[in-house]
Regions:
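A hydrophobic alpha-helix adjacent to the NAD(P)-binding/active-site core of NAD(P)-dependent oxidoreductases
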Residues: 1-2
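Active-site helix of classical SDR
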Residues: 13, 49
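A short helix-coil junction within the Rossmann-fold of NAD(P)-dependent oxidoreductases
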Residues: 15-24
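Active-site-adjacent segment of SDR/Rossmann-fold oxidoreductases
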Residues: 19-20, 38, 59-70
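Residue(s) in the substrate-gating loop at a strand-loop-helix junction
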Residues: 33
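Active-site loop immediately N-terminal to the catalytic Tyr-X3-Lys motif
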Residues: 38-44
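SDR active-site lid
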Residues: 66-136
Length: 176
């Protein structure tokens, strides 16, 4: 996951930057995730890679801007695909089984999944980022992602963590 989600983007950017710098123009678009701006339980490696790509992209945006090169990030939320069942980190100790099952039940609940975006909806956001000419770093894609991110900004980090813990674990766990 680190090779694909982080090192792949870094290597691609390093490969194209000399050409873009010579032309004094270019645009990199990295697909991160709302999981690079906030987290949910039991997907820590995925979240770590997306947070790394978010931080790296933001830093590189400062560095490359002086050469007319932009970097933009797309942060999709839930997708109407089999992504969750394929990528969810379920390789845990059996002590976590009940909690993992509860979290998976919430994430894959049909009512919840109805709020997720189609690949075509995310493609529209990518197109917007590629063509709008704005010096904007982040494009949060999908109604669920926008709602979750707005909630995090409104509540602040600690209150948001407590709300997520309550949503997924109820009284079984309190955010430390």
């Amino acid at each position: 996951m680190v090779n694909t989600n982080v090192l792949g983007a870094i290597r691609t950017t390093k490969a194209f930057t000399p050409y873009f710098r010579q032309k004094r123009a270019g645009l990199f678009i990295n697909t991160t995730s709302i999981g690079g701006l906030l987290t949910v339980p039991f997907n820590s490696i995925y979240h770590a890679t997306k947070w790394a790509l978010e931080g790296w992209s933001e830093s590189m945006a400062f560095e490359l801007n002086q050469f007319g090169i932009g970097i933009k990030t797309i942060e999709p939320g839930g997708m109407k695909t089999d992504f969750f069942t394929r990528s969810f980190d379920t390789g845990r100790h059996p002590a976590y089984d009940a909690l993992v099952n509860k979290v998976m039940g919430i994430i894959t609940d049909p009512k919840q999944m109805a709020t997720y975006s189609s690949p075509e909806q995310i493609a529209e956001v990518v197109y917007e980022a590629a063509t709008d000419g704005k010096d904007q770093l982040r494009y949060i894609a999908g109604a669920d992602a926008r709602a979750m991110y707005a909630m995090r900004l409104q509540l602040g980090d600690e209150a948001f963590r407590k709300a997520i813990a309550q949503q997924f674990f109820g009284d079984a766990q309190k955010a430390a």
